[in-house]
Amino acid sequence: MIKPIPRISSRRNGRIGSRKTGRRIPKGIIHVQASFNNTIVTVTDVRGRVVSWSSAGTSGFKGAKRGTPFAAQSAAVNAIRTVVDQGMQRAEVMIKGPGPGRDAALRAIRRSGILLSFVRDITPMPHNGCRPPKKRRV
Protein backbone atom coordinates (compact mmCIF):
# COMPACT_ATOMS: atom_id res chain seq x y z
CA MET A 1 0.00 0.00 0.00
CA ILE A 2 1.20 3.46 -0.86
CA LYS A 3 0.95 5.93 1.99
CA PRO A 4 -0.26 9.43 1.10
CA ILE A 5 2.38 12.11 1.48
CA PRO A 6 1.25 14.63 4.12
CA ARG A 7 1.27 18.26 3.03
CA ILE A 8 3.78 20.19 5.07
CA SER A 9 2.37 23.67 4.52
CA SER A 10 0.38 25.56 1.98
CA ARG A 11 0.08 29.23 1.12
CA ARG A 12 -3.48 29.24 2.48
CA ASN A 13 -2.52 28.53 6.07
CA GLY A 14 1.17 29.46 5.86
CA ARG A 15 2.97 32.75 6.12
CA ILE A 16 2.13 35.98 4.38
CA GLY A 17 5.06 38.16 3.43
CA SER A 18 8.72 37.76 4.18
CA ARG A 19 10.43 34.81 5.78
CA LYS A 20 13.44 36.82 6.97
CA THR A 21 12.36 39.09 9.78
CA GLY A 22 15.79 39.99 11.15
CA ARG A 23 16.65 42.48 8.40
CA ARG A 24 16.17 46.20 9.11
CA ILE A 25 15.09 48.13 6.02
CA PRO A 26 14.92 51.91 6.49
CA LYS A 27 14.23 52.72 2.81
CA GLY A 28 12.60 50.73 0.04
CA ILE A 29 10.74 50.71 -3.26
CA ILE A 30 7.07 49.76 -3.55
CA HIS A 31 6.06 48.41 -6.95
CA VAL A 32 2.34 48.35 -7.79
CA GLN A 33 1.34 46.41 -10.90
CA ALA A 34 -2.34 47.05 -11.61
CA SER A 35 -3.91 45.08 -14.44
CA PHE A 36 -7.60 44.84 -15.18
CA ASN A 37 -7.76 41.38 -13.59
CA ASN A 38 -5.46 41.64 -10.56
CA THR A 39 -3.21 43.98 -8.58
CA ILE A 40 0.23 42.88 -7.37
CA VAL A 41 2.15 44.91 -4.76
CA THR A 42 5.85 44.10 -4.30
CA VAL A 43 8.10 45.77 -1.72
CA THR A 44 11.86 45.69 -2.38
CA ASP A 45 14.90 47.24 -0.77
CA VAL A 46 16.90 49.86 -2.67
CA ARG A 47 19.02 47.15 -4.33
CA GLY A 48 15.91 45.46 -5.74
CA ARG A 49 15.74 42.40 -3.48
CA VAL A 50 12.15 41.43 -2.71
CA VAL A 51 11.24 41.88 0.94
CA SER A 52 7.48 41.34 0.84
CA TRP A 53 4.74 40.96 -1.73
CA SER A 54 1.01 40.48 -1.91
CA SER A 55 -1.69 40.40 -4.54
CA ALA A 56 -5.45 40.60 -4.60
CA GLY A 57 -5.55 36.82 -5.15
CA THR A 58 -3.40 36.04 -2.10
CA SER A 59 -5.50 38.47 -0.05
CA GLY A 60 -8.49 36.17 -0.49
CA PHE A 61 -10.25 37.61 -3.54
CA LYS A 62 -11.15 35.24 -6.36
CA GLY A 63 -12.41 35.71 -9.90
CA ALA A 64 -13.60 39.11 -11.04
CA LYS A 65 -13.34 40.56 -7.51
CA ARG A 66 -9.53 40.58 -7.83
CA GLY A 67 -9.69 43.54 -10.20
CA THR A 68 -11.61 45.81 -7.83
CA PRO A 69 -10.10 48.81 -6.02
CA PHE A 70 -10.94 47.31 -2.61
CA ALA A 71 -8.94 44.17 -3.43
CA ALA A 72 -5.97 46.34 -4.46
CA GLN A 73 -6.23 48.27 -1.20
CA SER A 74 -6.15 45.13 0.92
CA ALA A 75 -3.23 43.72 -1.12
CA ALA A 76 -1.24 46.92 -0.48
CA VAL A 77 -2.04 46.81 3.24
CA ASN A 78 -0.92 43.16 3.46
CA ALA A 79 2.36 43.82 1.64
CA ILE A 80 3.23 46.90 3.68
CA ARG A 81 2.31 45.52 7.10
CA THR A 82 5.37 43.26 7.21
CA VAL A 83 7.88 45.93 6.10
CA VAL A 84 6.57 48.50 8.59
CA ASP A 85 7.32 45.92 11.30
CA GLN A 86 10.86 45.65 9.88
CA GLY A 87 11.37 49.39 10.28
CA MET A 88 10.72 50.87 6.85
CA GLN A 89 10.17 54.63 7.10
CA ARG A 90 10.80 56.00 3.58
CA ALA A 91 9.82 54.58 0.21
CA GLU A 92 9.51 55.31 -3.47
CA VAL A 93 6.41 54.13 -5.33
CA MET A 94 6.45 52.80 -8.90
CA ILE A 95 3.01 52.25 -10.43
CA LYS A 96 2.59 50.21 -13.59
CA GLY A 97 -0.57 49.34 -15.50
CA PRO A 98 -4.00 50.75 -16.32
CA GLY A 99 -6.09 48.82 -13.78
CA PRO A 100 -8.71 50.15 -11.39
CA GLY A 101 -6.53 49.34 -8.36
CA ARG A 102 -3.88 52.00 -9.03
CA ASP A 103 -5.38 54.80 -6.95
CA ALA A 104 -6.70 52.54 -4.20
CA ALA A 105 -3.29 50.93 -3.68
CA LEU A 106 -1.62 54.36 -3.59
CA ARG A 107 -4.17 55.60 -1.04
CA ALA A 108 -3.47 52.57 1.17
CA ILE A 109 0.29 53.17 0.90
CA ARG A 110 -0.13 56.83 1.89
CA ARG A 111 -2.25 55.85 4.91
CA SER A 112 0.34 53.33 6.15
CA GLY A 113 2.58 56.04 7.62
CA ILE A 114 5.56 55.50 5.30
CA LEU A 115 7.04 58.77 3.97
CA LEU A 116 6.96 58.74 0.16
CA SER A 117 9.84 60.48 -1.59
CA PHE A 118 8.14 60.25 -5.00
CA VAL A 119 5.46 58.42 -6.94
CA ARG A 120 6.40 57.46 -10.49
CA ASP A 121 4.16 56.08 -13.24
CA ILE A 122 6.16 53.51 -15.21
CA THR A 123 3.32 52.15 -17.36
CA PRO A 124 4.85 50.86 -20.60
CA MET A 125 3.58 52.91 -23.54
CA PRO A 126 4.21 51.66 -27.08
CA HIS A 127 5.58 54.04 -29.68
CA ASN A 128 3.12 52.46 -32.15
CA GLY A 129 4.41 48.94 -31.54
CA CYS A 130 2.23 45.83 -31.64
CA ARG A 131 -1.32 45.91 -32.94
CA PRO A 132 -3.81 46.03 -30.03
CA PRO A 133 -6.45 43.32 -29.62
CA LYS A 134 -9.73 43.75 -31.47
CA LYS A 135 -12.64 45.50 -29.78
CA ARG A 136 -15.04 43.31 -27.80
CA ARG A 137 -18.50 42.69 -29.19
CA VAL A 138 -20.90 41.79 -26.40
UniProtKB/Swiss-Prot annotation:
InterPro entries: Ribosomal_uS11, Ribosomal_uS11_bac-type, Ribosomal_uS11_CS, Ribosomal_uS11_sf
Localization terms from the record: Plastid, Chloroplast
Keyword Plastid carried by entry: yes
GO CC entries: chloroplast; ribonucleoprotein complex; ribosome
MF-aspect GO terms: rRNA binding; structural constituent of ribosome
Superkingdom of this protein's organism: Eukaryota
Gene Ontology BP annotations: translation
Family the entry assigns: Belongs to the universal ribosomal protein uS11 family.
UniProt name for this protein: Small ribosomal subunit protein uS11c
Species name: Lemna minor
